[in-house]
Amino acid sequence: MAKTIQAIRGMNDCLPTQSPLWQKVEGVVKNVISAYGYSEVRMPIVEMTHLFSRAIGEVTDVVEKEMYTFEDRNGDSLTLRPEGTAGCVRSGIENGLLYNQEQRLWYMGPMFRHERPQKGRYRQFHQCGVEVFGLDGPDVDAELIMMTARLWRELGIAQHVRLELNSIGSLEARANYRTALIDYLEQYQNVLDEDCKRRMYTNPLRVLDSKNPDVQAILGDAPQLSDYLDAESKQHFAGLCELLDAAGIEYTVNQRLVRGLDYYNRTVFEWITESLGSQGTVCGGGRYDGLVEQLGGKPTPAVGFAMGLERLVLMMETLGNTDVRRSVDVYMVTAGEGTMMAGMKLAEQLREQVPGLRVMTHFGGGNFKKQFKRADKVGAAIALVLGEDEVAAQTVVVKDLAGGEQNTVAQAEVAKLLAHLA
């Protein structure tokens, strides 16, 4: 017997028992974003490798350790996308969407990072991202945060997430802070772990979000980024906080929040949950006003966020918030000569007359008992029964599978009877 082939580690199937909750989450996400007037964009899964090294940063963990990179037959270095913002910016520049234009875009799809698989963190994962180009005020930052807050309410998880905010200022402000932070950290090299020592001179702001308790202890007296912010960044952040206060959105200012990608400036934010253990960030984003120019476009302000769908689904499962619509509403049961085609025709008629009604037809024969058992297994609410007598009389038996009651009705009337299920 041939050896069975397994899925790649960290890349998971979404099985029929799991997909309804995924569809619910995806549907809510799309509906909320669409309510704000944003438009969908779809980008390739594979991009040129240098897009990510230029956008994300050469010395970030993503570029150094986590990307799936390969050389194609033409000798070009290609990478499975580890995130969506860089590709969205590339698409906007290439297709002339960004120059002197305002764009509000969203996308959804798989991303890839070669990380150690664990609960809430996988090598293939799915993100929804929202990006706004051409607007530089704190008002659009606030709208994106308000959008995410609405999404949590729609998903029923608003009481289990909290918002953390920070401003990391301009490139110049961060450069000044970077120098001060390195000077401070050099005094504690005996405390820093190898990861932090490596980051200290290449990307010292990442030391701030180290999970090492010894490192966190010495950061208590480290220079504060807020002391190095430029006046415009301070004003922008104050405006954002004022708008969030007016909207009634609670938040905490976390001065160690820097995000893991190099392109951010000014506003950064994360939504955190305690429901997922160590993988507590369900959504993160911020401003990246320099990225469009960095990738070859004209200077264009931009802000956005991304959320991990696996973590949202996992969070809803953890909280028991798993009510989803059944995948089958009506199960068509037939028995007797000539009844199969009549059943298929009636099922098709119902699909046309009641948009959204989910009708499954039984195939493979078997007596009524076997067919009703199958109807129960797929979770149908109603069984429609067609025998030879019903076909001749143009009627159908409508059976409630939960209560057991059944009635015979004219086939012409059954659509009205089932409309409430759609």
Swiss-Prot record:
Family: Belongs to the class-II aminoacyl-tRNA synthetase family.
Cellular component aspect of the GO annotation: cytoplasm
GO biological process: histidyl-tRNA aminoacylation
Gene name, Swiss-Prot/TrEMBL: hisS
SUPFAM superfamilies registered for this protein in UniProt: Class II aaRS ABD-related (SSF52954), Class II aaRS and biotin synthetases (SSF55681)
The protein, known as: Histidine--tRNA ligase
Annotated signal peptide: none
Quaternary structure and partners: Homodimer.
Reaction(s) the record says it catalyses: tRNA(His) + L-histidine + ATP = L-histidyl-tRNA(His) + AMP + diphosphate + H(+)
Compartment list: Cytoplasm
Keywords, alphabetical: Aminoacyl-tRNA synthetase, ATP-binding, Cytoplasm, Ligase, Nucleotide-binding, Protein biosynthesis
HAMAP family associated with the record: His_tRNA_synth
EC number(s) recorded for this UniProt protein: 6.1.1.21
GO molecular function ontology, one term from the record: ATP binding
Main location: cytoplasm
